[in-house]
Amino acid sequence: VICAAFASSVAARDIEPKPLHYELPSWFKQTFLEIPVDVQDAHTRGKKLLIFFHLDDCPYCAYLLQENFTEGPNREKIESKFDVIAINVRGDLPVNWIDGTVYSEKQLARKLGVFATPAVLVMGPKPEVAHKIMGYKKPGVFMDLLGL
């Protein structure tokens, strides 16, 4: 049993994805991370706020960005329906959350249970977390989960 567990952990380690550098899309909203203000700004323009939680050099973040946020019809749909901001799960920038508490990016990720990247939170207008998507999803599945 121990040999089988060791063999499976070695096999899993052999297929671990390699780090992959990426840039966040230039159309993502530049913000002071005042989430209540960002939610209100989006709502005023008939959009929702989408928060993209990422990790530097995360290959699955790179894939999700490339397939959905960088080019093509998915980007156009997302950009027309959402203001998108990015939060680094290991970042130290201050984030004013919807309850008025200021967290670092990494503290907020922990508070919200973001245990894998990429993760996407869709904010409702009240403001509240309306929807949470954890991990990489293929483009069609991702768009379905966003309701697009």
Model-derived regions, located:
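Short active-site neighborhood of thiol/selenol oxidoreductases, capturing the structured segment around
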Residues: 44-59
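Typically the conserved alpha-helix immediately C-terminal to a functionally engaged Cys/Sec
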Residues: 61-79
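Bacterial N-terminal signal peptides
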Residues: 1-5
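Loop/turn elements at helix/coil->beta-strand transitions in domains of secreted/extracellular proteins
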Residues: 45-49, 80-85, 115-118, 125-129
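Non-catalytic, surface beta->alpha helical segment in thiol-disulfide oxidoreductase systems
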Residues: 107-148
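N-terminal leader/targeting and pre-domain segments
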Residues: 13-45
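Sec/Tat signal peptide C-region and signal peptidase I cleavage site
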Residues: 8-12
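Structural alpha/beta surface segment adjacent to cysteine/selenocysteine redox centers
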Residues: 87-115
